[in-house]
Amino acid sequence: MKVLLYIAASCLMLLALNVSAENTQQEEEDYDYGTDTCPFPVLANKTNKAKFVGCHQKCNGGDQKLTDGTACYVVERKVWDRMTPMLWYSCPLGECKNGVCEDLRKKEECRKGNGEEK
């Protein structure tokens, strides 16, 4: 299950980069995440390697956790919801451990893509 989730999340990250790079909007209804997975929010950065927002989320009545060691931003989902698309922010870097994005005490510029929805 973790491998499937990681693969789905990685594909989403690549999709998010492509959407931001092409500055196009794609409706979420176009994607089939299956019955037990949901897309994790991501933020792009200047190296074009998007990272996940946090490491845990509720999905279809259950919990989803990213694999330990996965790069993430220490940003809450409600903060991501309020971010202005295409505006650069200073984002704290983290690494997933047991469903928590642990702060690495480093920051990099990141931004929410144009096609990202709440």
From Swiss-Prot:
Alphabetized, the UniProt keywords read: Disulfide bond, Glycoprotein, Secreted, Signal
Question: Keyword GTP-binding, does the record have it?
Answer: no
Q: Where in the cell is it found?
A: Secreted
Instruction: List the carbohydrate attachment sites.
Output: N45
The answer to keyword Disulfide bond applying to this record is yes
One Pfam family assigned to this protein is EVA_Class_A
Q: What does this protein do?
A: Salivary chemokine-binding protein which binds to host chemokines CCL1, CCL3, CCL5 and CCL22.
Report what the protein is called: Evasin P546
Q: Which organism is it from?
A: Amblyomma cajennense (Cayenne tick)
Taxonomic lineage of the native organism: Eukaryota, Metazoa, Ecdysozoa, Arthropoda, Chelicerata
